[in-house]
Amino acid sequence: DWERREGPDAIPDQIRFERRWGEVRRYANDRGIRILGDLPLYVAADGVDRHAHPAFFRTDAVAGVPPDYFSEDGQLWGNPLYDWKAHKAEGYAWWVERVKAAFRLYDILRVGHFRGFAGYWRLPAKAKTPETGRWVKGPGPDFFKTLLKAVANPIIAEDLGDITPDVTALRDQFKL
């Protein structure tokens, strides 16, 4: 239970933080400094997004990456994967709101694990190692056509990991 774990002061603390952050951001912006924020592709398995919007997440698979120059064995992250068909059916509204919320905090947004929008490493939910995964096509251009109609702020694509021509093409198509 969130309230019991975080305590009765957690919500006022969050409000105070948001107000103070707004002051810091305005101070920086007034001096020509833009704030760069980070938006990870995946959410936490035990996070509020997954619990508040279960239809947008798969329960049979989790995220990771295959062996690459960062890890010779690959990585089993364990984050829930998105049900991209469900997101598309809703016009990617959850994503649009997620990105808009990030832009209430930041001026520029770096999207982590960008390559997952072109293709991502899908592992069975009960996987013990990353070798059991496989590449699955991501939402690609359809997602960014919708997102960028709603959000005009600058987005930077993280380019770490196994960057294949389809990832580069997606990044370049939308000038990210």
Enumerate the predicted regions with their spans.
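Alpha-amylase-like alpha-glycosidases and glucanotransferases acting on alpha-linked glucans and related
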Residues: 1-20, 42-176
